[in-house]
């Protein structure tokens, strides 16, 4: 995180950006700024406009109106090639590496010959503390290291503006810490990072500034240290008058009051030797008034278990739900 308030001109300044799809206003005059050595976190619910704004900055989608100021020059629209030339690189949530190619081949893929510099690559690896075997296959890397290879692809192209889309979504806490350590080293070189995430604790740890998008607008923006968690949550999910709610929104508001109440410690869900696709012999009990955390690496079976409990997948074993008027029991051989 940047600790000094003395900054050069912004790396990126988006002004009054508008975008419409089929008559629906997706972006409504967005202003967004990124400085050197800064992490600017971008939050918002699904459909808030985050992805559209980043696609416009990366040259994937044109804006209907507005300007992007980069390096002191104004642009009405960019192409992906032009964005790369201006030093903008989008790192997707799922790294787009070729698993059967080496790490070196992945980093250099698609680069012009004049940009191919092994010494530059080695310098970047050393600066970021990466100890890759450049000749090993990219498919052998864990998710955190794949993210770093994607970032290195951008840095080899002299990118100064990195857009990280949910970079920790598939990472364990240890992998997240390793990624953050390398990002801090990267920030010291003057790179600016747009960090898209829904994880507030991580955002508070890594971000200098936070902007919250809602319904195509910037609902809240400021220094991380000056924004409370309540402010951020309220900006993401504001209280609105009932008359402006849709029927489905009203239903969701009514549901909590209609749920049966149980004394704390009363079992509301019990699993006994539950087996399904991606998991086996899972036994656990969820009690009223508690939050039961389910942790594991990517592919450990967490999603499959949740989908089985919801009824989307077949199961073998025993499930008992006690929260209904009468206990509900379901078992399969």
UniProtKB/Swiss-Prot annotation:
Binding site for ATP: 44-51
ABC transporter domain boundaries: 12-240
Cleavable signal peptide: none
Molecular function GO terms recorded: ATP binding; ATP hydrolysis activity
Keyword annotations: ATP-binding, Nucleotide-binding
Family according to the record: Belongs to the ABC transporter superfamily. AI-2 autoinducer porter (TC 3.A.1.2.8) family.
Name used for this protein in its record: Putative autoinducer 2 import ATP-binding protein LsrA homolog
């Amino acid at each position: 995180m940047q600790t000094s308030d003395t900054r050069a001109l912004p790396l990126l300044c988006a002004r009054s950006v508008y975008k419409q799809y089929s008559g629906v206003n997706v972006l409504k005059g967005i202003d967004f700024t990124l400085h050197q050595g800064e992490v600017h976190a971008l939050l918002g619910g699904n459909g808030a406009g985050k992805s559209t704004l980043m696609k416009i900055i990366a040259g994937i989608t044109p804006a209907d109106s507005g300007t992007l100021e980069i390096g002191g020059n104004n642009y009405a629209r960019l192409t992906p090639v032009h964005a790369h030339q201006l030093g903008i690189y989008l790192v997707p949530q799922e790294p787009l590496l070729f698993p059967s190619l080496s790490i070196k081949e992945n980093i250099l893929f698609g680069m012009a010959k004049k940009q191919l510099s092994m010494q530059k690559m080695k310098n970047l690896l050393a600066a970021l503390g990466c100890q890759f075997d450049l000749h090993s296959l990219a498919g052998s890397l864990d998710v955190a290291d794949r993210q770093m290879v994607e970032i290195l692809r951008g840095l080899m192209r002299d990118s100064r503006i990195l857009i990280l889309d949910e970079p920790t979504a598939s990472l364990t806490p240890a992998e997240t810490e390793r990624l953050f350590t390398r990002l801090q080293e990267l920030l010291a070189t003057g790179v600016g990072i747009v960090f898209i995430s829904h994880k507030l604790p991580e955002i508070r740890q890594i971000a200098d500034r936070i902007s919250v998008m809602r319904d195509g607008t910037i609902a809240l923006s400021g220094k991380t240290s000056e924004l409370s968690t309540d402010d951020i949550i309220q900006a993401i999910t504001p209280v609105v008058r009932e008359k402006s709610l849709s029927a489905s929104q009203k239903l969701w508001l009514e549901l909590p009051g209609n749920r049966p109440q149980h004394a704390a410690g009363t079992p509301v869900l019990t699993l006994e030797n539950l087996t399904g696709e991606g998991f086996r012999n899972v036994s656990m009990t969820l009690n009223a008034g508690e939050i039961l955390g389910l942790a594991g690496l990517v592919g450990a079976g967490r999603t499959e278990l949740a989908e089985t409990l919801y009824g989307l997948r077949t199961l073998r074993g025993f499930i008992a739900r006690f929260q209904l008027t009468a206990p509900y029991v379901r078992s399969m051989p």
